[in-house]
């Protein structure tokens, strides 16, 4: 078998890894063997946190809705129950946005919820 010279592919692979580790601190950004491990770990963190991000944002939206609802005399669980009874199908992301940016609209939603809870 003929000899295989891999200078071009090895350099390309090293350049790719070092490009991905650009901005890392110390030798993690400029030594291939260490950068390769750092890039792998960064990929693991990125994969994990893309999934965690969904949970984190849901918790944030619930906290914002809860705070806004409590200002108007309801807890989050009462508010969520009232939304279901009033057949208001707005997701948590939109409710949190309304609660933060449009107090009047959120107040009218809470009034509808209170009416359904009282009935």
From Swiss-Prot:
GO biological process entries: ribosomal large subunit assembly; translation
Keywords (A to Z) from UniProt: Ribonucleoprotein, Ribosomal protein, RNA-binding, rRNA-binding
Pfam family of the protein (one): Ribosomal_L20
UniProt keyword Protein biosynthesis, yes or no: no
Source organism superkingdom: Bacteria
PROSITE patterns documented for this protein: RIBOSOMAL_L20
Signal peptide positions (record): none
Keyword Ribonucleoprotein included in the entry's annotation: yes
Record-level GO cellular component terms: ribonucleoprotein complex; ribosome
Transmembrane domains' residue ranges: none
InterPro entries: Ribosomal_bL20, RIBOSOMAL_L20_CS, Ribosomal_protein_bL20_C
Coiled-coil regions, chain positions: none
GO molecular function list: rRNA binding; structural constituent of ribosome
Function: Binds directly to 23S ribosomal RNA and is necessary for the in vitro assembly process of the 50S ribosomal subunit. It is not involved in the protein synthesizing functions of that subunit.
UniProt family annotation: Belongs to the bacterial ribosomal protein bL20 family.
PANTHER family: 39S RIBOSOMAL PROTEIN L20
Protein name: Large ribosomal subunit protein bL20
Protein source organism: Delftia acidovorans (strain DSM 14801 / SPH-1)
């Amino acid at each position: 078998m003929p000899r295989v010279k891999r200078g071009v592919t090895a350099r390309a692979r090293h350049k790719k890894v070092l490009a991905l580790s650009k901005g890392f601190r110390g030798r993690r950004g400029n030594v291939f063997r260490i950068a390769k491990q750092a890039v792998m770990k960064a990929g693991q963190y990125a994969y994990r946190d893309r999934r965690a991000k969904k949970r984190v944002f849901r918790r944030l939206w619930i906290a914002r809705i809860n705070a806004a609802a409590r200002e108007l005399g309801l807890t989050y669980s009462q508010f969520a129950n009232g939304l279901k009874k009033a057949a208001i199908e707005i997701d948590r992301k939109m409710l949190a946005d309304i609660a933060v940016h449009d107090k009047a609209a959120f107040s009218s939603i809470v009034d509808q919820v209170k009416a359904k809870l009282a009935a």
